[in-house]
Amino acid sequence: LRVAGSHGQTVIHLPSGPSPSTLQLGEPSFLAEELGVPVVSDFRPRDMAAGGEGAPLIPFFDEFVFGAGPPRVLQNIGGIANASLAGRGVKTFGFDTGPGNCLMDLAARRLSGGRLAYDRGGALALRGRPDEARARNLLRLPFFSRRPPKSLDRSQFGAGFLARHFPSRGKSPEDLMATVTYFTALTIADAYRRFVFPRARVREAVLSGGGSLNRALVLGLRRLLHPLPVRIISDFGIAPLAKEPAAMALMAALAVEGRINHCPKATGARGARVLGKITPA
């Protein structure tokens, strides 16, 4: 092991306004002490200092891994969902498409009285029927029509949003979970139609992150994006939950060499920079 990259736990991300700010928890000094190698952390602030949103960071990794192949849309579904367009003959770019797992996880906790941290495999949603009209109506919210570059803090799709737009009254737990899951898939498909498909003839979509393990979400995406093939990143030898850690490792390795490690086209930064702060071993 030569170097480690630590993204940390994001507790706030406010890229807009006169004083952009972001905060990730996780002290790299303890990691450096434990691992005995330099640790690169705090990647987002440098991008924001250069006028960017500080997110998404993953398009750089997507270009590095998939840039020589046919045009693909790479969809990471963590708490927030973000998409990258990468491949031969296209200019790599990316943006946050909307909620990823955050709303579905909140719904699972609310509906189970706290017993479930998430809807494992989409089992609850698969037993329900989504209210498609309610979900489609929410696409009128300003974020979805805003052009990239754009990024989100998960608080924008937090408990208040869930209670306001997905009330439990008159709905079975299965139907409510199905509706929230359908809405999540719908925001991704809608983002492609608005911002990805006009830029390139995409061969396929490739999913990663925890959301790619949710069968209800994946089935919803396949229906909404048909006939575009929707694959899982494990088809390419990368575990779905390993993509973001691999991206941090790549960014860290490049940072200690003083090499560019982000995609300004995705974040809106004024130019290419070296992101991250280095804590020596």
What are these regions (language model features)?
Residues V202-R222:
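Glycine-rich phosphate-binding loops at beta-strand->alpha-helix junctions
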Residues P15-T22, E33, V37-L116, V274:
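Phosphate-binding/catalytic loop of phosphoryl-transfer enzymes
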Residues F93-A185, A189, G258, T267, ...:
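Conserved ATP-utilizing enzyme core subdomain
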Residues R222-A247:
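Conserved phosphate-binding/catalytic loops in two-lobed NTP-binding clefts
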Residues L1-R2, D190-V202:
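Phosphate/pyrophosphate-binding loops at sites that engage ATP/ADP/AMP, CoA/4′-phosphopantetheine
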